[in-house]
């Protein structure tokens, strides 16, 4: 767990965008070399880059990488119960993952830069607008699967209680193993308003 914490801190404090996006470089170079030529400059592809190497217009931020960031933090939360990991899950889900799909669900981004410019002095590898077909077609199905599974991240049950992980108007009715039925309603206009009201309609007797 200590090694995973070290990786998490490096990503979130030095290699992640404010949107939860990560993997800033499509093509780049690394001074770390290779195992057989440690002093050489090595070409890298689809990588995190150096600390704070977070360009805006040329950011790669592949949609699949942003989903991977969500999944990594979800596993870290399941292991520890620490809410800081769910903060990243929420950030990715509502920002860097949603940006990868159009409102009508028919066009997609492979990359998710923070700034689009028509005046760059060079050509980028991927389109600057969402398109219906991407030659590397991993991101569209991955995005749809993640959005269809979003409700699975909303709540978590544990022996100690229930975690409300994501804010959003919804209802929950579930059986809490040997404790009985739990039913609640969450009312909110989040993210447009910050007020959240949770009403417990049925509470297990053993809770």
Feature names for model-found ranges:
Residues 1-207:
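Glycan-recognition and catalytic cores of secretory/periplasmic carbohydrate-active enzymes
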